[in-house]
Structure formats: C-alpha cells, structure tokens
Amino acid sequence: MNKNIVILGTQWGDEGKGKVVDCLTKDSSYVVRYQGGHNAGHTLVVNDKKIILHLIPSGLLHKNVIGIIANGVVVSPFELIKEIKMLETHNIFVHKRLFISNSSPLILQYHIEMDIAREKKLGISALGTTGRGIGPAYEDKIARRALRIGDLKNEKTLSIRLEKIVNYYNHQLVSFYKHKPVDYKIILRDLLPTIDLIYDMIKDTTSILHTAIQSNKKIIFEGAQGSFLDIDHGTYPYVTSSNSTIGGVITGTGVGSKSLDYILGVTKAYSTRVGYGPFPTELFDDVDKHFSKKGHEFGSTTGRKRRTGWLDAVALCRSVRINSLSGLCITKLDVLDGLHEIKICTAYKNINTLEIISFPDIDEWKNIEPIYETYPGWNKKTLGIKKLIDLPYEARNYINRIEEITQIPVDIISTGPDRSDIIFVRDIFFIKK
Ligand code: IMP
C-alpha cells in the first residue's frame, strides 16, 4: 500500500494541483507544503464556493487532516494569518492542526520591495515574478542571513537582527534601485502582534513527520509551481527560486526518498505559463482564446492572463524522468471539449540546423519549433464525467497516446472544477510499487 504520496506539477505551474491534493487528502492524515510560498495559488471549488489558498496546504479543508508548512517554504506571517481568517469565514478552523517549521525563512516587507524594485529595474528583461518577495527571501536563506519562523520566539534578538537586515536592504533599495526605503520600526510593530497568533504552531515539523511515518500515517506532499519553474531544472532564469521538482520534497521536509511511495505528476491537458520565458507550444490564435475562456486561464495569485499552448510532451517526458514519476493526473480535460482537432508536441526542431533537439539549453530555446502529432477532437461534453468508459472515444485515445509517449500510466483524470468531477482510473493508494 502506498502511504506517502507526492503531488507535483509537471509543467509551468497552475496544473490544477490544489483540487487533486484536496481529493486525495480526504483519505490521509497529513498534508505537507514543502517549497515556494504565497506565490502559489491553489483554487478549490467546494459546494459551488471557490476558495483560493496561497500558503496553507489545500488538503486542510478536510477537518481531520493535519497540515504542515515545512522548512522548505518561505512564510509571510501576514499572509498566513489572512488565510487562517479567510478559512474561518468558511467554518474551517486550523487551530491545533496546522504546524509551521521553525526553520522556514520569513518573508517580510523588504523582500517584497526588493522583488518589485528589481523587476522594475530589469524593464523589458523582467522575469514576471509574482511580486511576493519569494526570490529575495530564498536569497537570504542561502546567504545565511534569513530571519526564520523560530526567530519569532525571541523578541529581543529578533529586533536586533531585523534592524541589521533592514539596513542592508535599504542600502541596496535606495542607492542602487532608487526605490523607497522600508522602516524597521514599522515592520517590527506590525510583526509583533502576529507572533502570539502563530506561536503555538511553530514546531520541529521534521520530527512530526518522522513520527507520522513511523506510525504508518498517510501523508500527502503538496507541490507548488511546476517542474519547469524549478530553480535548477526549469527554464532559467525564468524560474522561481525553489526546487519545485522532487528534490524539493526531501530537502524541504527532512523526509528521505525511501519514505516516498508514489509520485503523481499533475499535467494540464494543454499547457499554460504565466510570466515570461520559453514556451515552445504557445498559441496566439482562436485556440488560445478557447483555452483562456473555457479554462479561465487567469492567474489566481496575480490575475494575469496565462499564456496558453498545446500539450508539450517533450517537456512532459523530461519531467517524468526528473521527478521519477509513478503516474500522471491529467487535469482540465473538459477544456478540450468542442475543439475540432487536438495537437501534442512530440519533438523540438532547431529552425536553423533542422536538427531534432532533445532538450534545449538556455540560448537554444529561441531557435526551436515544435513538431506536432494531430488527433481528432470530440464534440461531446466530458465535463463532470466520473468513469473512464464514459469518456468519448477520441478523449480516451488522447489519454492513451499520452501514456504511450510518457511510458507511465494516467491514473487520475480531472473533468471539471468541482471536487466530484474526477475519474480515478486506479486507486493510487493501492497500486503496487
Ligand atoms: P516568483 O516565484 O514570484 O519569483 O516568480 C517567478 C516565476 O514563477 C514567474 O514567471 C511567475 O509567474 C512564476 N510563478 C510563481 N509561482 C507560480 C505559480 O504558482 N503558478 C504559476 N507560475 C508561478
């Protein structure tokens, strides 16, 4: 039996992981966020109500589940409290069942100002970040100057270190970026009242997870962003600042690879990307309009229009290998309903040399062109279908082709935004390894 399941994105984020996590956590004891911060946006529809979570693990909507924000996550205490209060308005209370690692780096105002100032200075070369301070917060961690959640427990040293860091940031913000400075006293004034609210949640989450594993509890590891936004394996520099591929689970929680039983790669039935950077299958035609409108392809964190394109199986196969995926979950299949034909990119060609490129390096991206296989679309509705057998023949064909190309099974198919719009092809908790 598979107890510990990782759910991660195989594309550029926004694959629909939140809903899948929500569905699978129903049968689990723990749900764990291991990387990223409130740059993520996980949208869930429960009883026709839309709930968007950025930082709190999506699975916490189930009342018996314990949520962990592990050490790999960068945490804004303000965002955390905002989300806790938002959940309370939906009668979801997280008291005594949400724990935050004492080692998680904090995101504070100076990170956000630095993120914004940098993007502004980069002008047309900007990365298109979410402006949430994610990059600067991870830089502080690597530079070993970060304030971490555990530091909130000692007000005196917190204020001394905060003042030093603010001086360091203000020097760059003002002298180099010609940006407004931040005020250390205001940051401290706003931060102090948050401490009481989260004090009891601060724990050694690694130990909690080790105990849970020893007690045979089921754990869902909830990824944020997608594999090609990974700082090491993504389309650098157009990436986020964390490891959104499988390695992030291990470093971001303190749980070793032997304890991970099944790795589910969540893949949208087509592709989207927010922000700038390579996107070989990008479309600018009526199909783009179809995906945007029918798929509501607007960022849940920033509201930006997502770029859209056909499914990129070259990237997907790379993702299968990077993450050692056990199986796939195809989401938003219903968005393809009504398209006359459907394409899958199965290779990249260099437009100058006409060579087939296995995976482009940084300078090669601009010279590649996707090679497509084309399949007939379907005119029937797949929205809300719950059994594989009920899908139109052409839709099953499309799924089969994805399995053939990637050489791994499609175990779950999401056919709409609601929790219940889902096909479980196999029960992944019971698949033999
Ligand atoms: P950052 O994570 O805010 O630094 O943004 C870096 C890049 O990652 C930008 O292109 C963002 O649009 C993208 N990004 C960050 N988080 C998400 C996400 O949750 N979904 C999709 N794209 C994201």
Swiss-Prot record:
Amino-acid positions noted as binding GTP in the UniProt annotation, renumbered to this chain: 13-19, 41-43, 306, 332-334, 414-416
Annotated keywords: Cytoplasm, GTP-binding, Ligase, Magnesium, Metal-binding, Nucleotide-binding, Purine biosynthesis
Taxonomic classification: Bacteria, Pseudomonadati, Pseudomonadota, Gammaproteobacteria, Enterobacterales
NCBIfam families registered for this protein in UniProt: PRK01117.1, purA
Localization per record: Cytoplasm
PANTHER family from the UniProt entry: ADENYLOSUCCINATE SYNTHETASE
Binding site for IMP: D14, E15, G16, K17, N39, A40, G41, H42, T130, R144, Q225, T240, R304
Species this chain originates from: Buchnera aphidicola subsp. Acyrthosiphon pisum (strain APS) (Acyrthosiphon pisum symbiotic bacterium)
Name assigned to this protein: Adenylosuccinate synthetase
Gene name of this polypeptide: purA
Keyword flag Nucleotide-binding: yes
Entry's family note: Belongs to the adenylosuccinate synthetase family.
